[in-house]
Design a protein with these regions (language model features):
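Surface-exposed acidic/polar loop and edge beta-strand patches at domain peripheries
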Residues: 1-152, 163-166, 170-355
């Protein structure tokens, strides 16, 4: 089997990027935009499983900086795909003397390449960034073996400051069609769910602050909703909820018509929650104008995604990282063939299907 490869490329007009691939999987990493995982392609089917917004983003450094707050900046440059969310998750906020951006600074900052290793059996790249608005630096190693459709990620945050720092930390992979469809199944090791208590979007059909057991919940009319089955495109839903109480920290989206799926498994000790964001045409104005069809399931240290000060006040699930302290999380994204529902993804990225 050919060895995995790592090559340089340009995305759009000028965004520096890397392509890490083997015979099974190809991924594009945007160095100039948060080290976003822009594509995750299952090569046997030729399908990129990650969602892209219906309207093209403005490229960083091209044209004037958009007016408005950090949410406006995020939406202007958002390319879909998969982001690191750090040190804030949700609305912009002031905390510990710093203005924290919407969804944090890490995803809007250029990262550098710190190390590259390419061998017959494995290719890896180590990326890094030093933040400006908090005393953190982040290191992320991404690796691909020659013979498996499994992308391994090892990410470390380090507090270089003299004081303990509060933060929220997560990953934001967003999945779209054709993987996502009404034929698809969403399976997970989570046992409990809780809807966001402040998400009052017009398309949100779920009651606010409602607890339940995965995957069943009642909508605002009292009708049953099976969250493991995606609604159809254009069905007008806009949902935010949180997955909790994981027996094992994993999820999978399987499309039996296409005969393959995508899954994620991670260290649940550091990321015990996952935000579930779903748009099926519910946001009919800016920024999606009714055209979004996306489900993102986002492992996170904390919940809800309402900004760091709100999380400290509401749930106390934020991280506190001491001076000089580091924290490390490991995640694996796996692409797999199959038509049956997934009952488990183990920490090595092996996928187990039901009967």
């Amino acid at each position: 089997m050919p060895p995995p490869t790592l090559t340089e490329t340009i995305v759009g007009r000028a965004c520096r990027a890397l392509v890490l691939e083997n015979d099974w999987l190809s991924t594009t990493i945007l160095l100039d935009q948060g080290a976003d995982i822009h594509t995750l392609v299952y090569k046997p089917k030729g399908v990129d499983v990650l969602w892209k917004p219906p309207r093209p983003p403005r490229e960083p450094g091209v044209g004037p900086t958009p007016a408005g707050d950090s949410l406006a900046v995020w939406l202007t440059h958002y390319r879909g795909g998969w982001q690191t969310i750090f040190p804030n998750f949700g609305p912009a906020a002031e905390h510990q003397g710093a203005p924290l951006d919407f969804h944090g600074e890490a995803a809007r900052t250029a990262w550098q390449v710190d190390a590259v290793e390419v061998a017959e059996a494995r290719a890896s790249v180590t990326l890094g960034v030093t933040l400006l608005k908090s005393p953190f630096r982040i290191e992320r190693q991404m690796a691909l073996d020659a013979h498996r459709p499994v992308l391994s990620i090892r990410e470390t945050i380090t507090n270089d400051g003299p004081e303990a720092m509060d933060c929220m930390w997560g990953h934001h992979p967003a999945f779209g069609a054709p993987l996502l469809s009404p034929d698809s199944f969403i399976d997970t090791g989570a046992r409990l769910i809780e809807t966001d208590d402040g998400y009052a979007a017009p398309g949100n059909d779920l009651p606010l602050g409602q607890a339940g057991r995965w995957p069943a919940i009642a909508n605002r009319r009292g009708e049953p909703v099976d969250l493991s089955r995606p609604p159809a495109p254009g069905s007008g839903h806009s949902r935010v909820l949180f997955l909790k109480d994981f027996e094992n920290s994993w999820y999978a989206i399987t499309n039996p018509v296409l005969g393959f799926g995508a899954g994620l498994v991670w260290d649940g000790r550091l990321f015990p929650y996952a935000c579930f964001w779903q748009e099926t045409g519910g946001v009919r104005e800016y920024p999606f104008f009714g055209a979004a069809y996306v489900t993102a399931i986002e492992p996170n240290s904390s919940y809800p995604g309402q900004g760091l000060p709100a999380v400290i006040h509401k749930t106390g699930t934020h991280l506190v990282v001491g001076p000089g302290e580091s924290r490390t999380v490991e995640l694996k994204a796996v692409l797999y063939s199959g038509v049956r529902r997934v009952i488990r993804i183990d920490p090595h990225g092996n996928v187990w299907h039901g009967n």
